A protein has these predicted regions:
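Compositional signal for N-terminal targeting/processing segments
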Residues: 1-261
């Protein structure tokens, strides 16, 4: 949350609601998560016990799906959910190695999008924002431009103007995708992943979020350290200096990768 663009969304909603007539429906922002307890996390391999100690209200995407169902779908309303790419999967199941699985594969269909799509197939659609994909190369993974650069070549013919387009039953959606998403799938195409796509700029021109100076400070650093997420996924963050460095570097490192594509 230490980035200006997140705060700007709240400010925009506030300004809009102040401009509406008193009896007009207000623009709502729904928080799709609860407060996790990372201070309860036990280092070591993840298992049901140490994960449950962190996610005390249950599986996160189940929690999120229930909020959207109760607050939006059951009321016959619509919402735009901004979530991480994998959480938005609907029809697509993210593959993983399974020793006893057919072709040694199995598929996770329990992301937020998949949970909602199963119950409301005609009302749930997913749209991907232009981003880098990952591809396996030997024993490591590298970032690639979508469709190995074909998508950006086509966008360049349109002057790189921002545009949204269908992937479902469309020529672009029928293009083969060799990224990590194609693992365990035969003849995988981009349209199997998402229903639509929004192109903003070439990857080399995208910018990262803007860190808010002083968002984490001497007054709140102890609580921030106790609740800092996924401590087993990154270098230790032990003090305010480490925290500020992490917040600043996080978007920069992603954009450095994008700018090299």
């Amino acid at each position: 949350w230490g980035y200006q663009e997140y705060v700007d969304i709240y400010k925009a909603a506030w300004r809009l609601n102040r401009s509406l007539p008193p009896d007009a429906p207000k623009f709502r922002i729904l928080n799709l998560s609860y407060i996790f307890r990372w201070d309860n996390f036990t280092p070591g391999p993840r298992n049901p016990e140490n994960v449950a100690a962190v996610f005390t209200r249950g599986t996160v995407d189940k929690f999120r799906a229930e909020i959207i169902e109760q607050e939006v779908l059951q009321k016959g309303e619509k919402a735009l959910a901004l979530v991480g790419t994998t959480h938005a999967f609907t029809k697509y199941g993210s593959p993983y190695f399974k020793y006893n699985g057919d072709n040694f594969c199995d598929y996770d269909h329990d992301w937020l999008g998949g949970r909602l799509f199963r119950k409301y197939p005609g009302r749930v659609f997913n749209i991907m924002l232009h981003q880098a994909f990952n591809k396996r190369e030997g024993d490591s993974y590298i970032q690639i431009s979508p469709l190995e650069g074909l998508l950006e070549k086509i966008m360049a013919l349109n002057g790189n103007k921002p545009v949204g387009f269908d992937l479902l039953d469309s020529p672009m959606g029928r293009q083969p995708d060799p990224s990590i998403y194609s693992m365990c799938y035969k003849d995988f195409t981009l349209g199997q992943l998402f229903d639509g796509y929004i192109f903003l700029k070439p990857l080399s021109q995208l910018e990262g979020c803007t860190p808010i100076k002083g968002f984490v400070n001497e007054q709140n650093i102890e609580e921030a350290l106790r609740q800092f997420p996924d401590p087993d996924w990154h270098a230790p963050v032990k003090n305010l200096e480490d925290m500020v460095r992490f917040i600043d570097e996080n978007p920069r490192s992603m954009i450095r990768g994008y700018n090299s594509l």
